[in-house]
A protein has these predicted regions:
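Extended ligand-binding regions for polar small-molecule ligands
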Residues: 38-73, 205, 272-310
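C-terminal motif of bacterial Sec signal peptides marking the signal peptidase cleavage site
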Residues: 15-19
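Acidic, polar ligand-binding/catalytic clefts
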Residues: 118, 122, 129-193
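Extracytoplasmic small-molecule ligand-binding "clamshell" domains
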Residues: 31-153
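Short loop->beta-strand "edge-of-pocket" segments that line small-molecule binding or catalytic clefts
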Residues: 89-92, 110, 191-207
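Periplasmic-binding protein-like
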Residues: 174-182, 249-288, 308-322
Length: 322
């Protein structure tokens, strides 16, 4: 074969081979390795207590100051200041579904606790909407009351002996029970099953201390808000959440694959938190709570928000210290 023909055949063969080679891919390379999502901002693993936390016990922790009779001629410095200001500053949060959360349609804060605050405003100003809301984490509640950056806290706040050393409380306006929330089919049925499991609780709550007392081998992940606990449970970064059944019901209402399990770990009586030096405001708030117990308002608020917990058993009875 002539040299020219050989050269032409070689060039043609090379061109065909190049043409048959797969083209270089221009698609981006995808990293298929799995990375666990980060914990929410402010989350941490609580240090295990070196000794079992003591029970919080004292005589009649839920007893409060009796409402003043109508027309009582006594100094009311806090109430005078509030009426002059024309607004009531209320500490609560936006992550407690059913109790205080933002309505997705209106953007307004709504819920059982919000309605309790509105009734206090109604009696104080003749208007249920004279409220300024301050968003607090559970760990910020006591300090906010002590430095008077809020007038009251209505935020699923359990009345305890230790907290009574720092602030005053109204009478009980709701009675909850601490329980456990898990993913259906998890195999966890009680607090005993939380041994060596990861459990979410919010920093600064009674739930955290009680969980460490009844199940010290659990690893407790603390977060700023209960809505953060819902996220880490859904992402399987924890095995359970433990707090008041009322809060757990609000979380479970957002995810059909969650369930509340086990018996009550402890009663959780909610009270309105008030500065220690505001005795007249304590008595006033207790007057409002007496009214809504007797005129049916409490039951109407319950039926608006909390029927997921079952039919209303009626408002908690008031206990007074004087």
């Amino acid at each position: 074969m002539p040299v020219r023909r050989l050269l032409a055949v070689g060039i043609l063969t090379t061109a065909l081979l190049v043409g048959c080679a797969p083209p270089e891919s221009s698609a981006p390379q995808v990293d298929t390795t799995f990375t666990e999502p980060p914990l929410p901002a402010g989350a941490s693993v609580a240090a295990r207590p070196t000794e079992t936390p003591a029970d919080d016990e004292c005589a009649r922790p839920t007893a409060s100051l009796r409402p003043l009779p109508a027309g009582a001629d006594e100094p009311q410095p806090t109430l005078d200041t509030l009426r002059a200001k024309g607004r009531l500053v209320v500490g609560l949060d936006t992550g407690s579904n059913l109790f205080s959360f933002r309505d997705p349609m209106s953007g307004q804060l709504v819920g059982f606790d919000v309605d309790i605050a509105r009734e206090i405003s109604r009696d104080l100003f003749g208007d249920p909407n004279r409220l300024d809301f301050r968003i607090l984490t559970s760990a910020q509640r006591l300090e906010a009351l002590q430095d008077s950056s809020v007038d009251i806290v209505v935020k699923t706040m359990t009345i305890t002996c230790a907290r009574r050393n720092d602030v005053q409380f109204s009478t009980v306006y709701f009675q909850a029970q601490q329980r456990v929330l898990v993913v259906q089919g998890s195999g966890i049925r009680s607090v005993d099953d939380l041994a060596n499991k990861r459990v979410c609780a919010v920093e600064g709550t009674t739930s955290l201390r009680r969980l460490q007392r009844v199940q010290p081998s659990a690893t407790v992940v603390t977060v700023p808000m209960w809505s953060d606990c819902l996220v880490v449970l859904q992402q399987r970064q924890v095995d359970a959440i433990s707090t008041d059944d009322a809060i757990l019901a609000g979380l479970a209402a957002q995810d059909p694959y969650l369930e509340i399990v086990g018996d009550s770990l402890s009663p959780e009586p909610y009270g309105v938190g008030i500065n220690r030096n505001s005795e007249d405001l304590v008595r006033f708030v207790n007057g409002t709570l007496e009214r809504i117990r007797s005129d049916g308002t409490w039951n109407r608020i319950y039926n608006r928000w909390l029927t997921v917990l079952g039919p209303s058993l009626g408002p908690p009875s008031a206990s007074y210290s004087d």
